[in-house]
Protein backbone atom coordinates (compact mmCIF):
# COMPACT_ATOMS: atom_id res chain seq x y z
CA UNK A 1 0.00 0.00 0.00
CA UNK A 2 1.36 3.40 -1.01
CA UNK A 3 0.96 5.89 1.84
CA UNK A 4 1.11 9.66 1.34
CA UNK A 5 1.51 12.45 3.85
CA UNK A 6 0.15 15.65 2.31
CA UNK A 7 0.69 19.29 3.20
CA UNK A 8 -2.34 20.99 4.73
CA UNK A 9 -3.94 23.82 2.72
CA UNK A 10 -6.28 25.14 5.41
CA UNK A 11 -5.34 28.70 6.38
CA UNK A 12 -3.02 28.81 9.38
CA UNK A 13 -2.79 25.02 9.65
CA UNK A 14 0.74 24.11 10.71
CA UNK A 15 0.15 20.50 11.69
CA UNK A 16 1.20 17.45 9.73
CA UNK A 17 -0.46 14.05 10.14
CA UNK A 18 2.72 11.97 10.25
CA UNK A 19 6.08 12.62 11.91
CA UNK A 20 9.43 11.28 10.67
CA UNK A 21 9.25 8.74 13.50
CA UNK A 22 5.93 7.48 12.15
CA UNK A 23 7.45 7.21 8.68
CA UNK A 24 10.26 5.11 10.14
CA UNK A 25 7.72 2.70 11.64
CA UNK A 26 5.88 2.40 8.33
CA UNK A 27 8.96 1.87 6.20
CA UNK A 28 10.38 -0.60 8.73
CA UNK A 29 7.19 -2.62 8.27
CA UNK A 30 7.81 -2.69 4.52
CA UNK A 31 5.40 0.02 3.41
CA UNK A 32 6.22 2.69 0.83
CA UNK A 33 5.74 6.26 2.05
CA UNK A 34 5.74 9.48 0.06
CA UNK A 35 5.67 12.90 1.70
CA UNK A 36 4.64 16.12 0.01
CA UNK A 37 7.44 18.67 -0.10
CA UNK A 38 7.45 20.88 3.02
CA UNK A 39 4.50 19.03 4.58
CA UNK A 40 6.19 19.02 7.97
CA UNK A 41 7.84 22.45 7.95
CA UNK A 42 5.18 24.07 10.13
CA UNK A 43 5.75 21.44 12.81
CA UNK A 44 9.53 21.63 12.69
CA UNK A 45 10.17 18.61 10.42
CA UNK A 46 12.33 19.16 7.34
CA UNK A 47 12.16 17.21 4.09
CA UNK A 48 15.55 15.70 4.93
CA UNK A 49 14.20 14.32 8.20
CA UNK A 50 11.52 12.39 6.32
CA UNK A 51 13.94 11.20 3.65
CA UNK A 52 16.30 9.84 6.31
CA UNK A 53 13.47 7.61 7.53
CA UNK A 54 12.82 6.18 4.08
CA UNK A 55 10.21 8.51 2.59
CA UNK A 56 10.32 9.98 -0.90
CA UNK A 57 9.59 13.70 -1.21
CA UNK A 58 7.02 14.42 -3.94
CA UNK A 59 4.79 17.15 -5.35
CA UNK A 60 1.25 17.86 -4.18
CA UNK A 61 -0.23 16.13 -7.23
CA UNK A 62 2.00 13.07 -6.81
CA UNK A 63 1.04 12.72 -3.15
CA UNK A 64 -2.61 12.44 -4.10
CA UNK A 65 -1.87 9.40 -6.27
CA UNK A 66 -1.42 7.27 -3.14
CA UNK A 67 -3.72 4.49 -1.95
CA UNK A 68 -3.87 5.97 1.56
CA UNK A 69 -3.73 9.75 1.95
CA UNK A 70 -3.04 10.87 5.51
CA UNK A 71 -4.22 14.36 6.41
CA UNK A 72 -4.98 16.45 9.46
CA UNK A 73 -8.09 18.31 8.27
CA UNK A 74 -10.65 17.85 5.52
CA UNK A 75 -9.46 18.19 1.91
CA UNK A 76 -9.56 21.66 0.40
CA UNK A 77 -11.97 22.22 -2.51
CA UNK A 78 -8.99 22.38 -4.88
CA UNK A 79 -8.11 18.80 -3.87
CA UNK A 80 -11.43 17.22 -4.80
CA UNK A 81 -10.13 16.73 -8.33
CA UNK A 82 -7.60 14.19 -7.03
CA UNK A 83 -10.13 11.84 -5.43
CA UNK A 84 -10.16 8.36 -6.94
CA UNK A 85 -12.15 5.18 -6.44
CA UNK A 86 -11.15 3.10 -3.40
CA UNK A 87 -8.66 5.72 -2.24
CA UNK A 88 -8.55 5.95 1.56
CA UNK A 89 -8.53 9.49 2.97
CA UNK A 90 -7.67 9.75 6.66
CA UNK A 91 -8.04 12.85 8.83
CA UNK A 92 -10.30 14.92 11.04
CA UNK A 93 -12.75 15.32 8.17
CA UNK A 94 -15.82 16.68 10.01
CA UNK A 95 -18.02 15.69 7.08
CA UNK A 96 -21.28 16.68 8.77
CA UNK A 97 -20.41 20.32 8.14
CA UNK A 98 -20.31 20.01 4.34
CA UNK A 99 -22.67 18.03 2.13
CA UNK A 100 -20.62 19.05 -0.91
CA UNK A 101 -17.54 17.09 0.10
CA UNK A 102 -19.69 14.11 1.09
CA UNK A 103 -21.29 14.07 -2.35
CA UNK A 104 -17.89 14.37 -4.04
CA UNK A 105 -16.49 11.46 -2.03
CA UNK A 106 -19.61 9.41 -2.52
CA UNK A 107 -19.67 10.02 -6.26
CA UNK A 108 -16.06 8.99 -6.80
CA UNK A 109 -16.10 6.04 -4.41
CA UNK A 110 -13.60 7.34 -1.87
CA UNK A 111 -13.22 5.64 1.51
CA UNK A 112 -13.27 8.35 4.19
CA UNK A 113 -12.00 7.69 7.71
CA UNK A 114 -12.68 10.50 10.18
CA UNK A 115 -10.49 10.50 13.26
CA UNK A 116 -13.09 12.29 15.37
CA UNK A 117 -15.48 9.32 15.08
CA UNK A 118 -12.95 6.68 16.15
CA UNK A 119 -14.39 5.68 19.51
CA UNK A 120 -12.52 3.35 21.89
CA UNK A 121 -14.03 2.36 25.24
CA UNK A 122 -16.63 5.08 24.82
CA UNK A 123 -14.07 7.83 24.24
CA UNK A 124 -13.02 9.74 21.12
CA UNK A 125 -9.45 8.52 21.41
CA UNK A 126 -7.82 10.53 18.62
CA UNK A 127 -9.89 13.65 19.13
CA UNK A 128 -9.29 13.90 22.89
CA UNK A 129 -5.79 15.43 22.77
CA UNK A 130 -6.90 17.92 20.11
CA UNK A 131 -9.92 18.79 22.26
CA UNK A 132 -7.62 19.34 25.22
CA UNK A 133 -5.46 21.72 23.20
CA UNK A 134 -8.49 23.56 21.81
CA UNK A 135 -9.97 23.90 25.28
CA UNK A 136 -6.80 25.30 26.79
CA UNK A 137 -6.24 27.67 23.91
CA UNK A 138 -9.86 28.87 23.99
CA UNK A 139 -9.44 30.00 27.58
CA UNK A 140 -6.31 31.92 26.56
CA UNK A 141 -8.02 33.47 23.54
CA UNK A 142 -10.91 34.52 25.76
CA UNK A 143 -8.50 36.43 27.95
CA UNK A 144 -6.73 37.97 24.95
CA UNK A 145 -9.88 39.23 23.22
CA UNK A 146 -11.27 40.62 26.48
CA UNK A 147 -8.78 43.46 26.11
CA UNK A 148 -10.10 46.79 24.85
CA UNK A 149 -7.66 46.93 21.93
CA UNK A 150 -9.38 43.86 20.47
CA UNK A 151 -12.91 45.16 20.96
CA UNK A 152 -13.46 43.44 24.29
CA UNK A 153 -14.74 44.83 27.55
CA UNK A 154 -11.30 46.01 28.56
CA UNK A 155 -11.09 43.59 31.46
CA UNK A 156 -8.15 41.69 32.91
CA UNK A 157 -9.46 38.17 33.43
CA UNK A 158 -7.27 37.62 36.49
CA UNK A 159 -8.66 40.59 38.38
CA UNK A 160 -6.40 42.55 40.75
CA UNK A 161 -5.88 41.58 44.38
CA UNK A 162 -2.82 43.57 45.44
CA UNK A 163 -4.10 45.94 48.17
CA UNK A 164 -7.46 46.02 46.33
CA UNK A 165 -10.13 43.50 45.43
CA UNK A 166 -11.06 43.72 41.75
CA UNK A 167 -12.74 40.44 40.73
CA UNK A 168 -11.62 38.45 37.71
CA UNK A 169 -13.72 37.39 34.75
CA UNK A 170 -16.43 34.76 34.66
CA UNK A 171 -16.00 31.94 32.16
CA UNK A 172 -19.18 30.06 31.25
CA UNK A 173 -18.35 26.75 29.60
CA UNK A 174 -21.07 24.86 27.75
CA UNK A 175 -20.43 21.12 28.00
CA UNK A 176 -18.40 19.12 30.48
CA UNK A 177 -16.08 16.93 28.43
CA UNK A 178 -12.36 17.00 27.70
CA UNK A 179 -12.33 20.39 25.99
CA UNK A 180 -14.44 21.87 28.78
CA UNK A 181 -12.28 20.69 31.67
CA UNK A 182 -9.12 21.83 29.92
CA UNK A 183 -10.65 25.26 29.32
CA UNK A 184 -11.81 25.36 32.93
CA UNK A 185 -8.37 24.46 34.27
CA UNK A 186 -6.69 27.27 32.34
CA UNK A 187 -9.40 29.74 33.36
CA UNK A 188 -8.92 28.76 37.00
CA UNK A 189 -5.19 29.21 36.57
CA UNK A 190 -5.96 32.76 35.45
CA UNK A 191 -7.95 33.28 38.66
CA UNK A 192 -11.27 33.44 36.81
CA UNK A 193 -14.61 32.18 38.09
CA UNK A 194 -15.92 29.19 36.13
CA UNK A 195 -19.46 27.99 35.47
CA UNK A 196 -19.84 24.66 33.64
CA UNK A 197 -23.16 23.72 32.03
CA UNK A 198 -23.49 19.95 31.59
CA UNK A 199 -26.39 17.63 30.70
CA UNK A 200 -25.34 14.20 31.99
CA UNK A 201 -26.03 13.66 35.69
CA UNK A 202 -23.09 11.28 36.20
CA UNK A 203 -20.76 13.77 34.56
CA UNK A 204 -22.16 16.57 36.73
CA UNK A 205 -21.29 14.54 39.85
CA UNK A 206 -17.81 13.85 38.46
CA UNK A 207 -17.23 17.55 37.77
CA UNK A 208 -18.54 18.58 41.18
CA UNK A 209 -16.11 16.17 42.83
CA UNK A 210 -13.23 17.26 40.60
CA UNK A 211 -13.70 20.94 41.36
CA UNK A 212 -14.94 20.67 44.94
CA UNK A 213 -12.15 22.93 46.21
CA UNK A 214 -12.21 25.33 43.24
CA UNK A 215 -14.27 28.37 42.25
CA UNK A 216 -16.40 26.30 39.89
CA UNK A 217 -20.18 26.02 39.71
CA UNK A 218 -21.68 23.10 37.78
CA UNK A 219 -25.18 23.69 36.40
CA UNK A 220 -27.60 21.22 34.81
CA UNK A 221 -28.01 21.93 31.10
CA UNK A 222 -31.50 23.12 30.24
CA UNK A 223 -32.52 25.89 27.82
CA UNK A 224 -33.58 28.00 30.78
CA UNK A 225 -30.32 27.53 32.69
CA UNK A 226 -28.28 28.19 29.55
CA UNK A 227 -30.18 31.43 28.93
CA UNK A 228 -29.63 32.50 32.54
CA UNK A 229 -25.94 31.62 32.82
CA UNK A 230 -24.85 33.08 29.47
CA UNK A 231 -25.77 36.54 30.76
CA UNK A 232 -23.04 36.18 33.41
CA UNK A 233 -20.30 35.34 30.92
CA UNK A 234 -17.32 37.55 30.22
CA UNK A 235 -16.08 34.61 28.16
CA UNK A 236 -18.47 31.93 26.85
CA UNK A 237 -16.98 28.74 25.42
CA UNK A 238 -19.16 26.12 23.73
CA UNK A 239 -17.59 22.67 23.63
CA UNK A 240 -20.61 20.64 22.49
CA UNK A 241 -19.74 18.02 19.85
CA UNK A 242 -21.71 15.05 18.55
CA UNK A 243 -19.11 12.81 16.84
CA UNK A 244 -19.92 12.53 13.15
CA UNK A 245 -23.10 14.61 13.34
CA UNK A 246 -24.03 18.26 13.00
CA UNK A 247 -25.08 19.64 16.40
CA UNK A 248 -28.25 21.70 16.92
CA UNK A 249 -28.04 25.48 17.40
CA UNK A 250 -28.58 25.47 21.14
CA UNK A 251 -27.29 28.99 21.76
CA UNK A 252 -29.81 31.26 20.06
CA UNK A 253 -29.37 34.76 18.73
CA UNK A 254 -31.59 36.02 21.54
CA UNK A 255 -29.20 34.48 24.07
CA UNK A 256 -26.25 36.16 22.37
CA UNK A 257 -28.10 39.49 22.45
CA UNK A 258 -28.46 39.10 26.22
CA UNK A 259 -24.70 38.81 26.76
CA UNK A 260 -22.54 41.64 28.09
CA UNK A 261 -21.36 44.01 25.38
CA UNK A 262 -17.75 43.26 24.53
CA UNK A 263 -17.86 39.77 26.00
CA UNK A 264 -16.16 36.96 24.08
CA UNK A 265 -17.93 33.96 22.56
CA UNK A 266 -15.97 30.91 21.34
CA UNK A 267 -17.26 27.74 19.66
CA UNK A 268 -14.69 24.95 19.77
CA UNK A 269 -16.82 22.62 17.62
CA UNK A 270 -17.33 25.11 14.78
CA UNK A 271 -15.59 22.64 12.44
CA UNK A 272 -18.63 20.40 12.88
CA UNK A 273 -21.07 23.29 12.46
CA UNK A 274 -21.11 24.63 16.01
CA UNK A 275 -23.95 25.13 18.48
CA UNK A 276 -24.19 28.93 18.36
CA UNK A 277 -26.68 30.53 15.97
CA UNK A 278 -24.51 33.59 15.32
CA UNK A 279 -21.17 31.80 14.84
CA UNK A 280 -19.42 31.21 11.52
CA UNK A 281 -15.99 29.77 10.70
CA UNK A 282 -13.06 32.19 10.85
CA UNK A 283 -9.32 31.71 10.38
CA UNK A 284 -6.23 31.83 12.55
CA UNK A 285 -5.08 34.99 10.74
CA UNK A 286 -8.52 36.67 10.94
CA UNK A 287 -10.13 34.97 13.93
CA UNK A 288 -12.84 37.29 15.25
CA UNK A 289 -15.80 39.42 14.28
CA UNK A 290 -18.40 41.35 16.24
CA UNK A 291 -22.08 40.53 16.12
CA UNK A 292 -24.82 41.61 18.53
CA UNK A 293 -22.13 43.50 20.44
CA UNK A 294 -20.24 40.28 21.23
CA UNK A 295 -16.78 39.23 20.00
CA UNK A 296 -17.15 35.93 18.10
CA UNK A 297 -14.16 33.58 17.77
CA UNK A 298 -14.84 30.77 15.29
CA UNK A 299 -11.47 29.23 14.37
CA UNK A 300 -12.13 25.58 13.41
CA UNK A 301 -8.52 24.39 13.65
CA UNK A 302 -7.21 25.87 16.87
CA UNK A 303 -4.57 23.15 17.43
CA UNK A 304 -3.08 24.20 14.09
CA UNK A 305 -1.85 27.39 15.74
CA UNK A 306 0.41 25.35 18.05
CA UNK A 307 1.61 22.70 15.59
CA UNK A 308 4.76 21.56 17.36
CA UNK A 309 2.68 20.41 20.31
CA UNK A 310 -0.42 19.21 18.50
CA UNK A 311 1.38 17.30 15.73
CA UNK A 312 3.20 15.13 18.25
CA UNK A 313 -0.07 14.32 20.03
CA UNK A 314 -1.91 13.68 16.77
CA UNK A 315 0.78 11.49 15.22
CA UNK A 316 1.16 9.42 18.37
CA UNK A 317 -2.53 8.56 18.26
CA UNK A 318 -2.67 7.93 14.50
CA UNK A 319 0.18 5.54 13.91
CA UNK A 320 -1.15 2.26 15.33
CA UNK A 321 -4.33 2.52 13.27
CA UNK A 322 -2.43 3.42 10.11
CA UNK A 323 -0.03 0.53 10.61
CA UNK A 324 -2.93 -1.86 11.11
CA UNK A 325 -4.57 -0.71 7.87
CA UNK A 326 -1.30 -1.08 5.95
CA UNK A 327 -0.38 -4.44 7.48
CA UNK A 328 -3.76 -6.15 7.20
CA UNK A 329 -5.53 -4.27 4.44
CA UNK A 330 -8.47 -2.01 5.24
CA UNK A 331 -11.29 -4.56 5.21
CA UNK A 332 -9.56 -6.95 7.60
CA UNK A 333 -8.48 -4.09 9.85
CA UNK A 334 -12.09 -2.90 10.04
CA UNK A 335 -13.29 -6.39 10.96
CA UNK A 336 -10.63 -6.77 13.64
CA UNK A 337 -10.80 -3.30 15.18
CA UNK A 338 -14.16 -1.99 16.37
CA UNK A 339 -12.78 1.48 17.11
CA UNK A 340 -11.39 1.78 13.59
CA UNK A 341 -14.66 0.58 12.06
CA UNK A 342 -16.44 3.45 13.82
CA UNK A 343 -14.12 5.85 12.03
CA UNK A 344 -15.23 4.81 8.54
CA UNK A 345 -17.73 7.48 7.48
CA UNK A 346 -18.00 6.73 3.75
CA UNK A 347 -17.15 3.44 2.07
CA UNK A 348 -17.23 3.22 -1.73
CA UNK A 349 -20.17 5.59 -2.04
CA UNK A 350 -22.09 4.45 1.04
CA UNK A 351 -22.48 6.48 4.25
CA UNK A 352 -21.44 4.23 7.12
CA UNK A 353 -21.69 6.69 10.00
CA UNK A 354 -25.22 7.18 11.28
CA UNK A 355 -24.64 10.71 12.55
CA UNK A 356 -23.27 11.78 9.19
CA UNK A 357 -26.11 10.17 7.27
CA UNK A 358 -28.69 11.82 9.51
CA UNK A 359 -27.03 15.23 9.20
CA UNK A 360 -27.34 15.17 5.41
CA UNK A 361 -30.52 13.06 5.14
CA UNK A 362 -28.67 10.24 3.39
CA UNK A 363 -28.99 6.47 3.51
CA UNK A 364 -27.00 4.72 6.26
CA UNK A 365 -25.60 1.19 6.34
CA UNK A 366 -23.45 -0.38 9.03
CA UNK A 367 -19.89 -0.76 7.77
CA UNK A 368 -19.61 -4.50 8.48
CA UNK A 369 -22.69 -5.11 6.35
CA UNK A 370 -21.19 -3.11 3.49
CA UNK A 371 -17.85 -4.93 3.32
CA UNK A 372 -19.25 -8.46 3.65
Curated annotation (Swiss-Prot):
GO terms for molecular function: alanine dehydrogenase activity. The active site is at residue 94. NAD(+) binds at residues 170-200. It catalyses: L-alanine + NAD(+) + H2O = pyruvate + NH4(+) + NADH + H(+). It is an enzyme of class 1 (oxidoreductase). InterPro entries: Ala_DH, Ala_DH/PNT_CS2, AlaDH/PNT_N, AlaDH/PNT_NAD(H)-bd, NAD(P)-bd_dom_sf. Its EC number is 1.4.1.1. The keyword Oxidoreductase applies. Disulfide bonds: none annotated. Pfam families: AlaDh_PNT_C, AlaDh_PNT_N. Pathway: Amino-acid degradation; L-alanine degradation via dehydrogenase pathway; NH(3) and pyruvate from L-alanine: step 1/1. GO terms for cellular component: plasma membrane. GO terms for biological process: L-alanine catabolic process. Keywords: NAD, Oxidoreductase. The keyword ATP-binding does not apply. PANTHER family: ALANINE DEHYDROGENASE. May play a role in cell wall synthesis as L-alanine is an important constituent of the peptidoglycan layer. Belongs to the AlaDH/PNT family. This is Alanine dehydrogenase 1. It comes from Staphylococcus aureus (strain bovine RF122 / ET3-1).
